[in-house]
Amino acid sequence: MTTTSRSGRQLWLPWLILVVSLTLITYSVDSFIRLPQQLGVSQQCRMSRMWPAYIDHTSNLEPFSPSGLWRKYRLYLYRERHFEPMDLPTGSPALFVPGNSGSYGQVRSVASSASRQFYKENGSGARRDEWKDAPPGVAHTDWYTIDFNEDFSAFSGTTLIEQATFINEVVSYLSDRYASAATHSYAAGERNTTVPILAHSMGGIAARLTAHLPNYPVGNIDTIVTLSTPHAFPPVPFDSSVEYVYSLINTPLDASRVTSRSARNVPPLLVSIAGGLLDTQLPSDPSSLSLARIGEAIAPSRISTYTGSLPSLWSSVDHVAVMWCDQLREKIARGFLLDMMAFGRVSDERNAGGVSGRSSVLRRRRELWRRALSLFDVSDAGNGEIGPLELTPSPDWLLEEDRETFVVENESPSFQRPTSGPDSALSVDQQNTVFRIPARMGDSDDGLHAFELITNLCVGWNPSSGMGAPLPQPVELVVQLCTSNPDSSDPVSGQRTSCRLVMPWQWELIPPSFLPRTDILMQESSQHIDTHLPENRPFPSADEIYHVPGYAFQRLRLDADLLQRQRIDWIRVERKTDSGVFVHQRGLKSFVRGGWMRQAAGRLKKHGSSLLLTQDQDSDIQHHYQDAGFATTSAIPIASEWLLKGFSSSLLARRIELVPSQCLVENLALYTLQSNDESLHSTDASFSPFMRVSDRATGDSRWYPQLASPELVRRIRARTYKGEPITFPLSLHGNAPFMPPARDSLNEIRVQLWTDQALLRPVPGKSLPCRSSVDSIRLSVDWKASAGLVLLRYRFLLAAWPLGLLSVCIGLSWLTWTQKPELPFPSPLTSITQPVFRTPFIGNRVDPLLGLLACTAIALILLDGMRLWLYRCMSSAEARGPTSSLIGMVLGLHNHASSAGLIPCFLLVSYATLLVIVAIIQWSFSLIAAIVTRFGLAHKLDWVGAATASSDPLKWNRRSMAGLAILLLSVVLLVPHQFVFLIMFLLQLLNTLRALLELQSNRGPPQSQESRFHQHLSILMMLVLLLPQKASFLVTWVRNLASVGIKTPNTMAAWMDHNLLDVAPIVVLVWLMAGGRMLEPARSKMEAKAIVFGFSIVGWYALVWGIRYTYRTYDAFNALCLVLAVCHWRSRRAGSRSHYSQGHAACNVAKHSDETSGMLHAHGKDEGVNLGDAPAEEFELRSGLASARLPIHHLALPSSVDPQSGGASIAEGNASTCAVVESSAQTNLGGDKLDELIADYLDVLDRYQRARNATSALFSSGYLKLTRAKIELGASRLSSNSYDSRLLAEVRATISNESSSQSSCGGLPAQASEISHISVARVQPDYSHLENDDYVLIQDMDESKVEKADSTIAGLRRRAAVGVTLSETDVVEGSGPHKHSPRGSLNDSVLRPVRVSAADAEGRGDAIKMSAVQPEKGHSKNSKYDVISTNQGDDQLGRMEQTKKVAAKPDALLQFGGLPSTALRGAQVDLRKALNQLLGAESHVHDDGVLQLALRLEVLTSAISTLKATAANQSECEKR
């Protein structure tokens, strides 16, 4: 990647992307908000009622809680007033675990329902009739609930581990309190008591985690029911500790546990119920155990479904309502009651028999919970307890007899019936019908038939149904499954018939699909509809109690494998009454419809993204035997079925367009259905067609009853119906992002359509095909609703991808700046709007921003395709389930076409989000800086201390290092690393503001200060995008701090958030930047590549893994901070010597602080030397030659000194001495001249090294004594920022030109001929002009007491030196302690170095004085500067001496104390000597100073390089 031409950029492109992205975001957000209306879903939950009371048991936990968590959390026992007789425990324990920010009081809905189903409502403790035979103290559940202080467990794995640890301690306490009873073989309490758990949201994760902790009570937790729990992956992937928890609980089970029959190896029964589409707080996809492949090796250990599939509810439920929804709480409460009633509470008995076979109690407990939840067919996700067919031992395994599921042995009664006579099983009359197994019509038809029976009659009392207390009801319909076997008593021709009764729990409750009654239909109009009529009520409705007998329909389905396994020969249906009791009370007509159907017999045809479903031409060829009275005489099946393979998706919403057949339309126009019709008319229409669409992998389903609605029938009879399709929305949970793809045997959508055969009778006078109630069903994609579903699943996109794009753009800018450090480092806004990127194969013909986004999108799409290929090829990846890293890459989809369409859209939205964030923050800093400056607060935010030059050896400030060590040590001992990250964020915020204020104050080289500000701002931008990951945890930590203090509980997670490495690199980098300097360029290609690689790693993790593993972006940024800190440290340690970039060693990158900025300018870059080819020693010397990098103490000149543009200073320009190299500039460039120059160079180099070492020793001694003086006087009286601005200059520079004719040195830079010679001497300043003041020189003043803006400090009045002409532009604001005085009264005078050319110096004289000037105009009453001659000043001073008393001369030490200490005076002496030796002041030989020697080395180096270049050119010419 190289720098592209700025002229080819389209500056409007970022804003165009912003407009397009805002359109996409608006479209998606609008779809998300209107998602329930678009999908036709609404929450239909009845409100639950209860009388709660809580009894605190926390004090009893202390002996069972060695971790000390009993001080942090609490345990309560729930009691329902007016039902439960006493507050003491009376039954079996059950525990409720709240979720993220959940309350312990959420248990009241389920616990209240359990009490109301078990006790009568009088408070006497009397049981209901169905529980009167239950063992005492077993069946009833004592509900305990845990108070987790409403912790945010979704954001912290540490919190989850602490909660799981406390759950284990509570279970140990409850097992001890509810000790098992004594038996003949065991003493009391010898066997473990099980404690089933009900958990909401993240509480389910904590409950599952208990088995992986050291204090887990083995065998005491055998049932975990979870509500809206994200089992597959974390809902908020901001913390690596949460991912660690998920990796523990989702580890596949060992093969030994699958085959073991030991009770200790039996996993807990895990029941997962998800809320569905209305749960927008947490997507319900990860709640599917089947789709996540959790526990699929032991299918009987799991149940997974959605609330929309639960009978009597059939509604999606939001995240909170899943706890109080009345229809759901009745099922859950009854499931716990039945579980304890049937299997007791002793752990060994409940887990006996292993995990498979008829003896497995686990299978029986699963069957009980399936019945309690009323799960049938595809609603029991993952193929029920069978599991995926890919994992079955063999195809014949399904037909084995031990596959029969039951709760109690012989629960389905069987009896013998004669084969002839009136009581024969084959006898048929008007109320009794026999359905024989259809004959095989071909080899392909084997096993394709299934039996369907639908009725609204009562089929018996079902106590195992989880729909509240069962209502007494008569048996109005009986179904028997009969088998004919040879009779042993009559071996010749005798047959014996054995029939098994179909029990009530085998019937599935389905929604009612009423056909409009014609007598009522004729009385109503479209404007006046009676909503109280059953056929006019919406579905589902919270006001309807569907499980009341006679309202909803009952369905019996007998699949082919069940009929084969039980060897059924025929099915006998006996109707006990003509009209049902409950049906008649509602004014409805009783009906029974049954018949055979072929499974998955429909035809599919794909049209682009749409799918067309039609009937198979041969699907109506069915064999019905003796079905008179129940079914029509035609051979039309009662149901049609389509299987859509690979059609499952959670991201796509669809529209169903159903076209009714003409036969159905004609029959709807002619049928007759009367109210309260008690007669038996088997051929009359009885119910409206209805449909169900379900996903076999997840168990999610959607019912569409009453396809022939009253409005449609009304239009048909009015002849206004024109054949328009009936439209319904559809969205199911299926294959989802970051989830394993569904198994092939489960990856299907099933569409089922039921039709009353009476509505498909031949129409008199018309020849119409009457094979089906619909001509076609079209499924098409609803793109608007799909946008809302995509937004629901990819909400964390904005937490990762903007950071990735920012990192890539800043990395490109950093690489370019490293190559060309003479350019300022670009701002973040410039980096993202004008990225330095060259599009491969196209170059500058495409805008760099467009090329960058396009290349990123193509790379991600190709990477996603490679990921899919690897996942399908690696069996180990599929075995890992949701923990596979391949699933979490990019978008985590298993459809490459979907990824290719979404990735460009996501990139545009991410870029627009980044653009808005960066622009707002960058503009906000400008606004804040303006406000701070306006109110005069800038000086309070000034840098503390002085940042030394880049060429200085890296020195360590003890106080700063101590603070850094304490901060890092606090991470280990006291606070989590997230808290320190927040501190570093705030510190970097302050650093960035300081850098901007200094940039606006114009106190230093603008290029370096601009680079520093942009670097600080770039790092801050990345910290801003990372802040949400850590701020979420801090909320939990602060809450815990308020509740239990700083003490950490004794758990395995005690030190998870106290890892020093999680924050140390960020702390070090921000600490380095807090010193007031910018980060140095790379010294070598290796370092440059390392920095670019660090930014690339952040971009890689953010774009590739950022959505699923967001926390990895923080780890990548940590590594980037480490690389930046190490490279900066190496550059500082070596004086920022870079042989990677050519010719920029002496650029303006030296001083970056208020204290030293502007003191000396850089030499300027060398134009003729290739440093990359120079020896290391020569390069090291040249890197240190820039006088701007010489170690000059910050007290040598005031911090406000800022060189003027256009002037000359001691430290600026390439000074040269023509006399030294005069001979080297001649035309004759022989080898003797070159040897002579090299010898001279080595001699000067030796003198330079000795002079510099001596200067360093003096500086070290002076600083040591200054430190001792600080200890003696105190930091408040002697600080690093102190400087008496009233002092005059004590340094005089003499610039002379020996000969203008000799000033032209061949090959030397142009500026070298301007200054012939520089000599520096220290002089005694003349303070006589101060003797006219009325005040003493040194006077303590309180700035807050100064009342007038025109008063000056201590009455001083400054005059300029002789011959110096000043203008208003020569004056700058003072710096130091009095900068930005609030009242403008204390303004420091500043020293101005004046740059004078050789010609000017010769005309004015041989001496130029650097002196002080008065403050800016407007800050003093003497707004005009007095420029006088020396004689005038002497006259004036003479007059002063006659009238005024001579004041004390100013001294640098008097500002620190009235009587300076010996250490302070010693420091002054040493530092003054060091400065003299550095500048060559008071030296008899003008060339002995470090400055002069460095300049001579510079000239000699340039001359030698020029001679080499000239010799090389002459050699080439001679060769030619």
Curated annotation (Swiss-Prot):
The residues that the database entry marks as glycosylated are N122, N192, N1214, N1253, N1297, N1387, N1513
Where do the catalytic residues lie? S201
> What would be an example GO MF term here?
phosphatidylinositol deacylase activity
- Which Gene3D superfamilies does this one have? alpha/beta hydrolase
Q: Which GO terms describe its biological process?
A: GPI anchor biosynthetic process; protein transport
**Pfam families referenced in this protein's UniProt entry, alphabetically:** PGAP1, PGAP1_2nd, PGAP1_TMD
Among the entry's GO cellular component annotations, what is one?
endoplasmic reticulum
Q: Which UniProt keywords apply?
A: Endoplasmic reticulum, Glycoprotein, Hydrolase, Membrane, Protein transport, Transmembrane, Transmembrane helix, Transport
- Report whether Transport shows up as a keyword of the record: yes
InterPro entries in the record: AB_hydrolase_fold (IPR029058), PGAP1-ab_dom-like (IPR012908), PGAP1/BST1 (IPR039529), PGAP1_TMD (IPR056824)
Highest taxon in the source lineage: Eukaryota
Compartment(s) of residence: Endoplasmic reticulum membrane
Signal sequence coordinates = none
Q: Which family does it belong to?
A: Belongs to the GPI inositol-deacylase family.
> What is the purpose of this protein?
Involved in inositol deacylation of GPI-anchored proteins which plays important roles in the quality control and ER-associated degradation of GPI-anchored proteins.
Q: What is this protein called?
A: GPI inositol-deacylase
Q: Which gene encodes it?
A: BST1
